[in-house]
């Protein structure tokens, strides 16, 4: 089943996108700063969400990791 139709997988993909964009913005600030328009604006917004909601994103990462390790089937 694709990540679009499975809610848990969709949340996992969104979380990974936020974490990746935040990491890239920390390592290469100019990479996302000049791309605030168009389709790439989504990645800039994900980086902002990751920076501003960092404790909540971290807790959600831990929760999803435990859920992935121990399974929920």
Curated annotation (Swiss-Prot):
Principal subcellular localization: Golgi
Keywords: Endoplasmic reticulum, Golgi apparatus, Membrane, Signal, Transmembrane, Transmembrane helix
Gene Ontology biological process: intracellular transport; protein secretion; vesicle-mediated transport
Entry's transmembrane regions: 53-73
Biological role: Involved in the early part of the secretory pathway.
Gene: ksh1
Entry keyword Transmembrane: yes
Protein family per UniProt: Belongs to the KISH family.
Residues in the signal sequence: 1-21
Native source organism of the sequence: Schizosaccharomyces pombe (strain 972 / ATCC 24843) (Fission yeast)
Disruption phenotype: Inviable.
GO cellular component, one term: Golgi membrane
Protein name according to UniProt: Protein kish
